Amino acid sequence: MAAIEDSPTFSSVVTPAAFEIGSLPTTEIPVDPVENDSTAPPKPVRITCPTVAGTYPVVLFFHGFYLRNYFYSDVLNHIASHGYILVAPQLCKLLPPGGQVEVDDAGSVINWASENLKAHLPTSVNANGKYTSLVGHSRGGKTAFAVALGHAATLDPSITFSALIGIDPVAGTNKYIRTDPHILTYKPESFELDIPVAVVGTGLGPKWNNVMPPCAPTDLNHEEFYKECKATKAHFVAADYGHMDMLDDDLPGFVGFMAGCMCKNGQRKKSEMRSFVGGIVVAFLKYSLWGEKAEIRLIVKDPSVSPAKLDPSPELEEASGIFV
C-alpha cells in the first residue's frame, strides 16, 4: 500500500503484487523503555517502517509464545515495504507472562503508539492513527483477538481498529488448559467484532512432532477462531507448512533453537511461507482499509497464485454475502 498523502486522496503510488516485496525501502528501529523519557514505550518494541517520506497506517504485531519480535524480520519488512508502519512489542523476557498480563501489556503498547510513535520514526515518516490494525502469530494471534474483543483493561477506549489478522492463532494446549482470558466460546459466530478479520492457518500446526505435542492443537487453533468470527471474514490455510515456518531462517540463541525444533515443520522453503504470510496480510489490509478487493478475491478464486499451497480452499465471507 502506498503512502497516504496529507490530502483527501489516499494513495497514488503503484506497488507490486502483495506476495512480492513492495516498492518502498524499509528500516528497523529498536526502542527500549527508558526511565524519565515520556516518549519511551512501556515494553521494548521493534518498529519496521518505510524510509520514504509519507503518512502510513499502523500495524501492531504480537509475537508468539516465548518468541522474540526480531524472529519475524523478513515478514515485517515485507509488509512495511508496501507502506505500513509495524510496531512489534516484546511482551516476554525470561518467562512468558500470564495471558491477561500479556493482553494488558499489549493495550499499554497500543496506547503508547497512538501518542508517541512519531518521536521514534524517521524524518518525514508519519503514522496515520486513523488506520490501526492488529496482527499476531500463535499466542500473539490470540492476544490480538483478545485486545480487539475488549479484554485489555489498559487500552484507551477511544482507540479503534480497522482490521484483525490472526496467523495460526493458539488459545492453549487443550480445551482444559487455555490461556487467560478465555475468549473461545465454541459457538459459531460468537465473536463480537465489527471489523474485517482474516485467519491464517497451517496444515502441520495440529500435528505431533515426534514426542512433542502439536503447537497449534485442534479446538484451539485457526479453525475454531475462524468459526467464531462473523462476516466479513477470510480464512487461508498453508497446507504444507508448520506453526513456526513463517519465522526467519537461522534464528539465534536457545530460544531460536527451540523455535526451530519444537513444532512440526514443513519440508518446503520457509521463504515461500514468509511470502505467503506477508502477502495475505498486505492484501487483506488493502481490502479492509481501502476497499481494494481485487487481490484478496483473486487469491480466493485462484489459490494457485499463492506461494504456498492452500488447502482447504480459501474462504472470504463478506458481510453482504459469500464470495468464492
UniProtKB/Swiss-Prot annotation:
Pfam families: Chlorophyllase (PF07224). One of its GO terms (biological process) is defense response to bacterium. A motif (GXSXG) lies at residues 136-140. Induction: Induced by methyl jasmonate, coronatine, a phytotoxin produced by some plant-pathogenic bacteria or rapidly after wounding, with a peak after 30 minutes and a return to the basal level in the following 4 hours. Induced by methyl jasmonate (JA), wounding, infection with the bacterial pathogen Pectobacterium carotovorum, and with the fungal pathogen Alternaria brassicicola. Induced by transition from dark to white light. Down-regulated by dark. Keywords: Chlorophyll catabolism, Cytoplasm, Hydrolase, Plant defense. Gene3D superfamilies: alpha/beta hydrolase. One of its GO terms (molecular function) is chlorophyllase activity. It catalyses: a chlorophyll + H2O = a chlorophyllide + phytol + H(+); chlorophyll a + H2O = phytol + chlorophyllide a + H(+). Its main location: cytoplasm. Expressed in seedlings, leaves, flowers and siliques, but not in roots. SUPFAM superfamilies: alpha/beta-Hydrolases. InterPro entries: AB_hydrolase_fold, Chlorophyllase, Chlorophyllase-like. GO terms for cellular component: cytosol; nucleus; plant-type vacuole. Pathway: Porphyrin-containing compound metabolism; chlorophyll degradation. Catalyzes the hydrolysis of ester bond in chlorophyll to yield chlorophyllide and phytol. Shows a preferential activity toward chlorophyll a. Does not seem to be required for chlorophyll degradation during senescence. May modulate the balance between different plant defense pathways. Belongs to the AB hydrolase superfamily. Lipase family. This is Chlorophyllase-1. It comes from Arabidopsis thaliana (Mouse-ear cress). The gene is CLH1.
